[in-house]
């Protein structure tokens, strides 16, 4: 960033820094990075846009959202119907804004939908569910307490699983 300043380019350069997802070192019995837990699916994303106030924003954003965001910022037309992502310019302009409710993760027969509050995963064999996990990301950041049998969350769990099935069907088209 200092070099962009020195060259006089900082006022016209968008900087995007993203990282790879995490690596389990024995947490939850995993060694590696290929599973549906938050530690293995969450990745850092830092975006610096000239004339945008800096800060930390919440909300759900996926890497597929970067391209449409850059298109909007650079006033480049977005190819209609060809992108899965959605511009997160509204979040850059106001950290309280949201562009989507869920992020979707898929790995080897497992499907996970992640909202700001919950992470819900199912594993399918054919159309049959053979495993489930639900975590409250506010009260259990480390994902240690599977809430799948929680009566108090039954409606939320049902809605999250419905969203997983909808997203899975969309991807199969």
State each model region's role.
Residues 145-152:
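Active-site-proximal N-terminal segment of extracellular/periplasmic enzymes that hydrolyze or transfer
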